[in-house]
Amino acid sequence: MSLFRGIRTASILLTVGTLIFAATDALAASAPMSVSQLMLYQGADRETILVQGAKKEGQVVFYNSHTWFKAVAQEFEKKYPFIKVAEWRAEGADVMKRAVEESQAGRFLADVVESTAGNIGGIHSNGLLQEHRSPELRFFDDDVTKKGKSGVYYWADRETYISLGFNTSHIPAAEAPKRLNDLLDPKWKGKMSLAGGGTAARWVGAVVEMAGREFIEKLSVQNINVHNLSGAALANLVVTGEVPMSPTIFDSNIFVAKRKGAPVEWRPLDPVVANVGYSGILAKAPHPHAALLFIDYLHSKEGQQFIVKGGLSSPRDDVESLVNQKFKKTYFEAKYSVEEYEKKLSEWEELIQKVLVRRR
């Protein structure tokens, strides 16, 4: 009898222990997660948790620097009608400035920020971005993510490419340059222009890193006009024919103009500079559940397809962009820190002034 009694006692103790562990697990599962835990959570119930939390939050505040995000925000609201997207848009430098100044003032208003490399990098270097994970990350190459210990701080959501744009009324496609060395042909003397500021500097930097400073020296005899204009503004001059061609034109500007019937073409001449927009979640985001849902949607196949409709290219592996991307891309932000990149930009801008402007 004592043997059976012992077995029964052990069985009861085992059952009680199992119940205690089960109860402990249930309490752990139901316990609220910290924001940092939520940002890295990848459980099967992640979507449910985010939706429940977002319904209570009711909105996501999105600071960005590109007009096309309005369409993405509208589609997001259709999918999640209980979340209102409050959008603030400005130049990239102003997005960074506002995010930093609000943080310094203890005003935490924004959830998600989006801008190009230097600006998003500046926000990150101030310690303002939250490391996070997303099921969509598997569709993005490491070159377009800023990795942390367990997730990413920011990752690409759009790309445009800087290379040759030309007016076909002045330069037939069959005659236009097809390789970088073709720009040295004497027949292009006086017909080429560069944009101002960082757009031209990045192109010159890519050329220097691939072909050496000597190529820029050779290019100087072509009497290149350097305009104090953005890439988009210079593209408008290509559209009108005032500028026959330029190797510092964004593909997106040409594709949008071409849709409207303009006689223009864009051609990738290696190396092609990738101009990348990145997005991240602020560490003090007031609506963390909605922020994660938004960043998921922005990088989802559906969200990226809306980006492409706006004339941009997608860094996502399974989304087809407007331009055949079988060309060498230069990602400066993957090669240099923010500080190194700023130093390089200054060097390249000085090279433009010294070799292409002052020698004319």
Where are these regions (language model features)?
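Extracellular/periplasmic bilobal clamshell ligand-binding domains
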Residues: 321-360
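Bacterial N-terminal signal peptides
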Residues: 10-25
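Short, polar/charged alpha-helical segment
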Residues: 44-55, 65-84
